[in-house]
């Protein structure tokens, strides 16, 4: 389990430790690896069969790229402003590789089709 924080104001650490070894990255270096989760992965030479990630879009892009390079299956949880929450407004679409058979476009609605997607299937 790899988590990133801005500083030493950690939360959920004890809860996460109940599920396995926790590697921490902090932007200011006050706890764990200095930098972000990608720095923690590299510094600790971590390996995985599958990745589950949530967080800011730049991190998800880095995770997606890393997973593709290492041929690791990855699932990412996307966040977006959701005006309606039921898929009607299309305010939360993400571009996909597959064409939606209903709309005939390369989009998925994060609110109804996600929020978790196979990283290979979305373009972020």
Q: How should each PLM-predicted stretch be described?
A:
Residues 57, 79-115:
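Local cysteine-cluster metal-coordination motifs and their immediate loop/turn environment
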Residues 1-81:
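FNR/FR-type flavoprotein reductase catalytic core
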Residues 119-124:
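SAM-dependent methyltransferases
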